[in-house]
């Protein structure tokens, strides 16, 4: 009957409209979520990319020395919740550019430049002695882990 067709069509319209209102999850990487995504530099609490990690998509002039005013390790594992400053032992650079880790705040003092795509342990003078990092925007994009310095 005509009334049945109208009800069926109305139900279909409501069902379609309802489906459009269901939220979808974002597929993009989220900084500071404890996951080392492409486009980020990740500092790890332990050597060899182990333990909790802290992920960044930009340069940080000062990690901050104590809670609640510090960047902290976010991922699961040893060190989770601790401040990054003077606690990082290894780095995985996934930014597409070289990243320099500094002993002092404000990008100064002894440093180590990490090429893109290369997870590395920090040198002894920077292991657990790090206060800032800089993503080197003035350096050409790295290719297959090779960064012009």
Tell me the role of every PLM-derived stretch.
Residues 3-13, 17-149:
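Compact beta-sheet-dominated domain cores in extracellular/mature segments
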């Amino acid at each position: 009957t005509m009334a049945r067709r109208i009800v069926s069509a109305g139900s279909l319209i409501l069902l379609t409209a309802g489906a459009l209102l269901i939220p979808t999850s974002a597929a993009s990487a989220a900084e500071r979520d404890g996951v080392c995504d492409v486009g980020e530099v990740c500092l790890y609490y332990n050597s060899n990319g182990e333990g909790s990690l802290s992920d960044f998509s930009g340069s940080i002039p000062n990690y901050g020395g104590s809670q609640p005013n510090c960047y902290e390790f976010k991922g699961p594992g040893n060190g989770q919740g601790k401040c990054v400053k003077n606690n990082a032992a290894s780095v995985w650079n996934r930014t597409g550019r070289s990243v320099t880790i500094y002993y002092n705040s404000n990008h100064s003092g002894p440093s180590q430049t990490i090429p893109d795509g290369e997870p590395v342990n920090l040198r002894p003078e920077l292991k657990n002695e790090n206060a800032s990092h800089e993503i080197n925007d003035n350096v050409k994009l790295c290719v297959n882990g090779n960064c012009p310095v």
